[in-house]
């Protein structure tokens, strides 16, 4: 099986998790980045930009990803929870995966430990692209838990 890691990270918490995991797996890694970067000021990013995108279902333009996604059996998708679901650049990424035939395993992390956020994310991802097989991965787990889970994919 050939696996790819795709992630979004603003504060680098998710980036650090992905880097820790990839010392074990050595998968190809792609970062989803908003075309116009979010403010580096937390309050502006969280309470203005990200909140507006979620409330208005805005999927912002993202930087081009030069990847043949169908050359991978599975995509491991990592992101933080923003406003009870995934960050909207992830929505853009999922929208743009027109003909992906593999599985997308979803991994989310959040400051709060409410499992409803993972449920929201899975529901919202599936509503954006009904042709993709989204598989619930882990929510707010340790690097070791992630490694053990990913080894079974």
PLM feature spans:
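Short, conserved loop/helix-junction motifs that constitute active-site signature segments
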Residues: 69-70, 95-103, 114, 129
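Redox-cofactor binding/interface segments in oxidoreductases and associated redox assembly factors
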Residues: 77-78, 106
């Amino acid at each position: 099986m050939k696996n790819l890691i795709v992630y979004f990270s603003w504060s680098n918490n998710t980036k650090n998790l992905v880097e820790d995991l990839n010392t074990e797996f050595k998968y190809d890694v792609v970062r989803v980045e908003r075309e116009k970067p979010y403010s580096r000021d937390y309050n502006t990013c969280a309470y203005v930009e990200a909140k507006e995108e979620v409330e208005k279902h805005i999927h912002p333009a993202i930087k081009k990803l030069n990847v043949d996604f169908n050359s991978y059996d599975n995509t491991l998708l990592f992101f933080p929870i923003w406003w009870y679901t995934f960050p909207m650049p992830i929505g853009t990424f999922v929208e743009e995966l027109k003909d992906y035939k593999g599985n997308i395993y979803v991994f989310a992390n959040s400051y709060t430990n409410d499992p409803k956020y993972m449920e929201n994310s899975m529901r919202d991802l599936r509503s954006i692209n009904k042709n993709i097989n989204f598989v619930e991965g882990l929510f707010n787990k340790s690097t070791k838990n992630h490694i053990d889970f990913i080894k079974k994919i």
